């Protein structure tokens, strides 16, 4: 319907009326723009910002948590093991009901792998306390006692490893993760829970692998076949920062209480 027919219909009390059938008189009253209407309802902050005023966030808008830099060495705990042929980004972080948490990183992270491995979040948080202890200058093995035999095993070959040169975090194994949408929350949610890496036979998309890297996570590859670790195992990754800086393409890992193997 054209604009005049809409006007004719409105003038005819809502009865559908074509413009050429309207029997009334067309008038064009004078129009005067009143900017006060907008000045009273719309805030224009250009040139009038006050830096001393603290921004008030809504209850579901949260800042990103602090994220430590990559340490010289890493201790990773496998907290989820997924053997499906493909793991989608929607399985890594569901859509739908989680959309209201997009401005709340920690709130959104509570849904990570909830449809695939509901215990993942709890296990990742248990490991994260060790890294938080390191950032506070405390002993990670005191915060997470199960690390004591892990450090003992590491010290048999790397006696100089301590809280000053090691990071502790979680990792997951998936055969082929990252298929589907480009949502970066599939990686960021793991990161805010203390994730430091993914281990996979291959990555479903370049964009998921890139998202891992962008969020400071290591996209490890391992050949297909029997895994040299299981869910709950610890993996020691020595001199990982040096390897990243030198763009190394292959690496070795040490599983606590076991021997070295290629990763």
What annotation goes with each model-predicted range?
Residues 209-251:
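A structural-propensity feature for long, helix-poor, extended segments
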Residues 1-36:
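Mobile "lid/hinge" segments at catalytic clefts and subdomain interfaces of large enzymes
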Residues 176-179, 202-206, 226:
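Acidic, glycine-rich active-site loops and adjacent beta-strand->loop/helix elements
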Residues 196-201, 219-222:
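Short hydrophobic alpha-helical runs that function as membrane-insertion/retention elements
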Residues 41-197:
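Non-catalytic terminal/interface segments that mediate subunit docking, oligomerization
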Residues 252-259:
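Conserved small/polar residues in nucleotide/adenosyl-binding loops
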